Amino acid sequence: MKKFLALVLALVLALSLAACSGGAGYQIGIPADATNGGRALLLLQDLGILTLKEGVGLEATEQDIVENPHNVTIKAMEAANLPASLPDLDFAVINGNYASGAGIGDKVLTTEDAESVAAQTYGNVVAVKEGRE
């Protein structure tokens, strides 16, 4: 039996999301690699934090941001360093494996929708040998 599991991108809470509307220019850390950086930007768009160019999809980069109503600064960095960088950031979009490894699961605000394009494209598949279900 195969089960589809979405690779979790967790938006880790350092301050309340509502605080972003104050226009204080909060910093949000995202993974610097193209695959996870694009996924992070799509998640931020889904949360209403920013708007990306129409149709940019998973290839989204910081240059594709067309609206930034909360005046956030996107700070791209090595994905593995995001958990340790939380004290210097207001928020971070962190891959599930790094969030879990850092023991910050209690700070998860949201996760990527399992039906999203990103989850459908890059999700993990768990396969079990028949008879070992």
Where is each model-derived feature located?
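C-terminal motif of bacterial Sec signal peptides marking the signal peptidase cleavage site
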Residues: 15-19
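Ligand-binding "clamshell"
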Residues: 24, 88, 93, 101-114
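Bilobed "Venus flytrap"/periplasmic-binding protein-like clamshell domains
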Residues: 25-66, 119-122
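A bilobed periplasmic-binding-protein/Venus flytrap-type ligand-binding module shared by bacterial periplasmic
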Residues: 27, 122-133
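Extracytoplasmic/periplasmic, Sec-exported soluble proteins
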Residues: 32-36, 77, 84, 118, ...
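Solvent-exposed coil/turn segments that connect beta secondary-structure elements
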Residues: 33, 79, 96-98, 113-114, ...
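Short helices/loops that flank or line small-molecule/ion binding pockets
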Residues: 38-43, 63-93, 97-98
